[in-house]
Amino acid sequence: MTIYVSTGGYSNLSADKSSEKLIKAGISSIELSGGIYSKDTIDNLCKLEKKAKFQIHNYFPPPKIPFVLNLASQNCDISNLSLRHVDHVLDCCLKLGATHYSFHAGFLCDLEVAELGKKIKKKELYDREKSIDLFLERVFLISKKAENKGIKIMIENNVLSAKSKNEFQENPLLMCDAEECIKIIRQVP
């Protein structure tokens, strides 16, 4: 069994710098997640490829102008940014020899970067069924592109905090409970 350690715990470093720290500590299976933007991150990580195996998670590599990846967004700008980011990630997987790319299920509203992992401010929610349909449509598209590149995709469920549930009085995230996870999983390739 292989256990991957995430670079996400080093939010103040670029992924190549946090990977160097992990490699020095004896960790050679690294999940690239988060960190700060650096235009040379992928090139620098390629230099570490002989010392570590990489997988990529969600919002990596972080873009120069931050946004929240949302594959269920009904906002054309956000959905286009999200899909372009995923296309870039799949290319990064190829460069780094990563065989898997994981991303989170979508959201029923578009979040601000500062809200990630914290209480989400109440806002109008998108229709859940329409967002699920859009998410599935985009997952099919991503899945075909990934398969053509020999990359497997993984969808990670979301976690609804008590604060966000109280704020919205309903669930603004996809795939937080077993029923919805099963419903979506049964429809993906």
Kindly give the residue locations of the regions a language model identified:
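Active-site glycine- and acidic-residue-rich loops that bind
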Residues: 33-36, 126-137, 165-176
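Hydrophobic alpha-helical segments and helix pairs
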Residues: 89-141, 146-147
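Short loop/turn segments at strand-loop or loop-helix junctions that form parts
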Residues: 57-63, 103-108, 156-159
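Surface-exposed, active-site-proximal loop segments in enzymatic domains
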Residues: 63-81, 109-127, 168-169
